[in-house]
Design a protein with these regions (language model features):
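Nucleotidyltransferase catalytic core that binds NTPs
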Residues: 1-242
């Protein structure tokens, strides 16, 4: 029998999706800073199968998952999860969150980690308002990203909604904005919070272009991922649309 009380607090689970084509230090640093900010028990890295808002990744799913596994090796709090790759059809986030909610149960706090640009486009997502029934949303605000509320908020205060946001998101923030990130651990879903992450000017597009041109991509992504890329001859030949 478990010695953990039935009402013991459960630490939140972070969820970071992406094509990871390839995974790089920008992804890893974002996950680490989110883990630290919210005391996450773990962060799930979920490679997209068929993303609905962008062209399908050029690299096969098995290799993108393999690169993620290489990058996360030795990180006890980071896990690769292939649930979207095992599912047919578009990789809608709402379906992913439904699956994770069934897995972790109704009490566990789930936290969807998004960049600011993805958050601002949230109203275009499939069944986007249902996301808040299934998880919290943590928005990473890069210092170089222009805030839509007109001025930089204090370091310990989340931003106020403003005219730069779509009206639907203004309504969401008015109802769901978390006064403190610690609130995420107190409920399983429904809140929106913001935090500033370290800006790393690294993109998968840049890495692919460097590799297609035969140039070095060292120090932009883990050495284990570079070895995987070399072993499997990825990002070689005609890049087409890198």
């Amino acid at each position: 029998m478990s010695s953990v009380p039935a009402n013991a607090p459960l630490r939140p689970i972070g969820i970071l999706g992406g094509t990871f084509d390839p995974i790089h230090y920008g992804h890893l640093r974002l996950a680490e800073e989110a883990r630290e900010a919210l005391a996450l028990e773990r962060v799930l890295f979920i490679p997209a199968g068929d993303p609905p808002h962008r062209p399908a990744p050029g690299t096969p799913a098995a290799h993108r998952l393999g690169m993620v596994r290489c990058a996360l090796r030795g990180h006890a709090a980071f896990r690769a999860d292939d649930l979207e790759l095992r599912r047919s059809g578009k990789s809608y986030t709402v379906i992913t969150l439904e699956t994770l909610r069934r897995r972790y149960g109704p009490r566990r706090s789930l936290v969807l980690i998004l960049g600011a640009d993805a958050f601002f486009g949230l109203p275009s997502w499939h069944q986007w308002q249902r996301l808040f029934e299934l998880a919290h949303v943590l928005v990473a605000m890069r210092p170089d990203f222009p805030p839509p509320w007109g001025s930089e908020p204090p370091e310990d205060d989340p931003p106020e909604p403003g005219a730069g946001l779509p009206p639907a998101l203004q309504d969401v923030l008015a109802e769901r904005r978390a006064p403190k990130l610690a609130r995420f651990a107190e409920t399983p879903a429904g809140l929106v919070g913001f935090f500033r992450n370290t800006p790393l000017a690294i993109s998968a597009t840049t890495i692919r272009r460097l590799l297609y041109e035969g140039r070095s991509a060292r120090y932009l992504l883990p050495e284990a991922v570079l070895r995987y890329i070399t072993t499997h001859s990825l990002y070689q030949g005609d890049p087409g649309n890198p």
